[in-house]
Amino acid sequence: MLLIRRTINAFLGCIHCNLTATCILIAFVITMYVVLVSEPASVDGTMGNFLPFSKMDLATKRDRPFYSNCVNTQDYLLNPSYIKQNASFVMLTRNGELEDVIKTINSIEEHFNQWFHYPYVFLNDQPFEEDFKAKVRDVTVGALVEFGTIDEISWNFPSDVKDTFEFYNAIEDQGDRSILYGNLESYHKMCRFYSGLFYKHPLVQKYEWYWRLEPDVEFFCDITYDPFLEMLRTNKKYGFTIIIPELYWTVPNLFRHTKSFISQKGVTLGSLWKLFTKDYDIFESDDPELRDWINYDFQAKAKISEKIAIEQLLKKGDDFQQINDDKEGIMNLIHKARSRKHIVEDKFFNEEYNLCHFWSNFEIARLSVFDNDIYNSFFQYLEKSGGFWKERWGDAPVHSIGLSLTLDLDDVHYFRDIGYRHSTIQHCPHNAMGNEEFSYLASDSKFKRKNAAYDEGREFGCGCRCRCPKKKREIEDSMGFCVNIWVNLLNQQRGHERHVEALNGNEMEEHIREDYLRQFGN
């Protein structure tokens, strides 16, 4: 699987490939896609159900959409139990992105904020122009809008780093290797800022919650409830709408530094950690050598058989006739002598980063999930490693891994009912049945819809008045690897989550020894 992911990543990042190489890569990717992706695992982890994830009910007892359909927003707001939260939208942008900023604001206002009037915080590494601020205020309806400038220390790399040959050489080298955005210094700065500094800005610090926005994003469904309030009510601390694998060559050493941090600081991990890691501790045995050799379940039978065959051979002592007759034992002894222990390239302390991450250009979260001692120390540790410029660490994998140091799976919410697009990736749910129960009611004439046609409701749908683009494939189906892990873990008992059930090595060894002795005798 890792080889396949790396091949896909190489193809995605290889903008300078020649035609022949590109065709070969495309053929390989399509082949593996048919084998691995077109038949996603069912929610219980089996391959017996071939339905795409987008056509399945992924709700579990531990996490599900807050509402299974549209709600009457007017009644919701008038309910005495409704309490508006201390929350804000946050967007990092530049003066030249005004058109895309307005596009985002119009979309989130129409689908949500025209009813809830949450404030906006816009951040820029340069002062915002007056024209930019005026036009942004024109398109927000009844919401407070604040503009902030990021200070030099928060935006730029330290002078003892950025003024060195090593820094510029590392950036240029990433461009030469066609690492996506790797040669853009500004992109490295943005990732570093969002990884561990955005929540320190004074304008953001005023709030308990934030909802991240980007220029040029679209929302496809109406959000008729308050996500901040519902997260508070259900003890959720972080919410996402897309989870996908990262490009391997952007973060080759991120996990190594993370494991080093955990070891040095003695961090007690939350269960969310299991969402982002592959566990190689899949073989329970009293034999430490077997545990060390076996990384995959398919290796277990062969290694146990080898061990037993050699043990039986050695029991023959100095009887060379019996030794010579024991062909099975001799062959296994020779095989073991010639074998090298299989090294899993990115395995550290029996774990490997599986590359999954929450796509952080959309996230709704408590600021405290970042602004705490462990996460702040984690960011500082990564900062000192130089990975934000030596490699192209994105804020999405840093956020995801950093959150898993402290959060449990139950602290996280999948906003499956929120349709969302950024760049070329989109998630858009099917509408729930009965969307027509509560008709759309605009709070302002600018948001009135004429002859609006919504997607047909489905039994497994959860969206409210969604209108999904038809030409783009649903990300749950095209990159379902990480979604499958999420659903499998959430379907397990709290505190006992595993990707796969560990093999009982002692029991396997007992059965294999019995079979061996029946076949080959003493």
UniProtKB/Swiss-Prot annotation:
Alphabetical UniProt keywords: Glycoprotein, Glycosyltransferase, Membrane, Signal-anchor, Transferase, Transmembrane, Transmembrane helix
Active site residues of this protein: 363
Chain spans, region Stem region: 38-82
Glycosylation sites: 86
InterPro entries on file: Glyco_trans_15, Nucleotide-diphossugar_trans
Enzyme Commission designation: 2.4.1.-
SUPFAM superfamilies xrefs: Nucleotide-diphospho-sugar transferases (SSF53448)
GO biological process: cell wall mannoprotein biosynthetic process; protein N-linked glycosylation
Record topology, Cytoplasmic segments: 1-16
One term of GO molecular function: mannosyltransferase activity
Additional detail: Present with 450 molecules/cell in log phase SD medium.
Function, as annotated: Possible glycosyltransferase that transfers an alpha-D-mannosyl residue from GDP-mannose into lipid-linked oligosaccharide, forming an alpha-(1->2)-D-mannosyl-D-mannose linkage.
Family note: Belongs to the glycosyltransferase 15 family.
Protein name per the record: Probable mannosyltransferase KTR5
Organism: Saccharomyces cerevisiae (strain ATCC 204508 / S288c) (Baker's yeast)
